[in-house]
């Protein structure tokens, strides 16, 4: 079964086509990395998939439900961990978790919070105010908050942007543990991140997904020794 399916998904702003007849299928439990240079259409695509922007034309199915006719139900099945960490800076880590659990009216909230604290290893910072946390800890908390309502689909937007190498690798380990449990759509500018984490990668150019495949298959297609080189060749057309 597919978590996400699009059929000729298109978005135009006046005379400019930002997303152009996009056809995409993402499997249940898959970690799918959506890559592309700035202006390729990634952000608009994500906004349409999450119901924040209405398509000019085309269809979106989320968990086999038509998004246009089931938007409220679908919004309870997905969540977003945005590029800018979605945390309350003046609340402690525990208070953030309790607050978001209340917003989502989570049943058995104490049990849910305890599990997230354990999974994200937040014990040592549980009573720290969020604004005093390092970037890495803030990212952990932000992703934990995005999971508190038990979504079936999680959108991770630049989850390790601005983090040092150690904090980035630690967050990778956490994301890897989520693989197979929920569907994850990852957007990132770090090629090594997409290569390390993704089951499959889609590369966008001019509003279209021009290739999909594993990092290894795309490297082979582009005749490149690294995935970063493969990405450059694909988006510039050098491998064609």
Q: How would you name each of these model-derived features?
A:
Residues 98, 102-125:
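Conserved ABC ATPase "signature" region
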Residues 212-213:
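ABC ATPase "signature
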């Amino acid at each position: 079964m597919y978590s996400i399916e699009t059929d000729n998904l298109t978005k135009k702003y006046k005379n400019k086509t930002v997303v152009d007849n996009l056809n995409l299928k993402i499997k249940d439990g898959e970690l799918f990395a959506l890559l592309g240079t700035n202006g390729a259409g990634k952000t608009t695509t994500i906004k349409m998939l999450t119901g924040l922007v209405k398509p000019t034309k085309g269809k979106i199915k989320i968990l086999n439900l038509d998004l246009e006719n089931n938007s409220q139900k679908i919004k309870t099945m997905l969540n977003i961990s945005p590029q800018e960490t979605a945390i309350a800076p003046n609340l402690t880590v525990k208070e953030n978790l309790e607050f978001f659990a209340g917003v989502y009216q989570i049943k058995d909230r104490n049990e849910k919070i305890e599990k997230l604290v354990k999974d994200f290893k937040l014990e040592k910072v549980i009573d720290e105010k969020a604004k005093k946390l390092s970037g890495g800890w803030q990212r952990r908390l932000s992703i934990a908050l995005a999971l508190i309502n038990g979504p079936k689909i999680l959108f991770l937007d630049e989850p390790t942007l601005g983090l040092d190498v150690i904090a980035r690798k630690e967050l990778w380990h956490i994301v890897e543990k989520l693989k197979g449990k929920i569907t994850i759509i990852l957007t990132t500018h770090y090629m090594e991140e997409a290569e390390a984490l993704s089951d499959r990668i889609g590369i966008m150019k001019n509003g279209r997904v021009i290739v999909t495949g594993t990092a290894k298959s795309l490297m082979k297609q582009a005749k490149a020794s690294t995935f970063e080189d493969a990405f450059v060749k694909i988006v510039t057309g050098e491998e064609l």
